[in-house]
Amino acid sequence: MSETATSVDGRPLSKRGERTRRKLLEAAEAVFAELGYHDASIVKITEAAGVGQGTFYLYFASKKGVFDELVVDLNHRVRQAMTEAASQGTTRAEMERLGFAGYFRFVADHPALYRIIRQAEFVSPEMLHLHYERLTSGYVTGLRQAMEAGEIAEGDPELLAWALMGIGELVGMRWILWAGRDELSPEMLDELGRIIARTIGSGNGGR
């Protein structure tokens, strides 16, 4: 599924169309997170977005259509947040630590991420797979390059990427989502950096 926004018939959107589509996606994020997929409805989404039902169908074909597009949208934005944060690092361990911090900030701003991705397991399994495949794709490339450069220990970059994603997802769930925090404390982030450094075989704790 493409990350480029289009109308339901595949035509490029105007700036106004992009804004309307964004409003609908933000409304869908809130409605699906609060009510769950089965209790959510197009009526509730359009009411939350402040647009008519006819407008909805210019951008999405169905409730499942907007759900699938929402998964793609959240995936794109969380990857962007992590990449931008990680780009400030100068070593792989530093990049990992900063990338995780970017992920936790995104989770604090968008707690619906967890609820919607978990719903995808039952509503749209193919979108669940797409979400994680897109997360790991660039991650694997970066880890492989770090291994080839001798910056981290050699190993299976795909296995390492999935293991690190598991750490980030569960730490974010426990200490951001469940605890209602905006971010991990500096002390916890430092400790997590040391755990990651040991996991990837780097002598640098990310600080």
Language model feature labels by segment:
Residues 1-8, 105-106, 137, 141-148, ...:
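C-terminal peripheral helix-coil segments that are non-catalytic and often amphipathic
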Residues 18-26, 38-39, 50, 58-83, ...:
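An amphipathic alpha-helix adjacent to DNA-recognition modules
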Residues 69, 83-112, 160-164, 189:
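Hydrophobic alpha-helical connector segments
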Residues 76-79, 124-149, 158-162, 170, ...:
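Amphipathic alpha-helical packing segments from all-alpha helical-bundle domains
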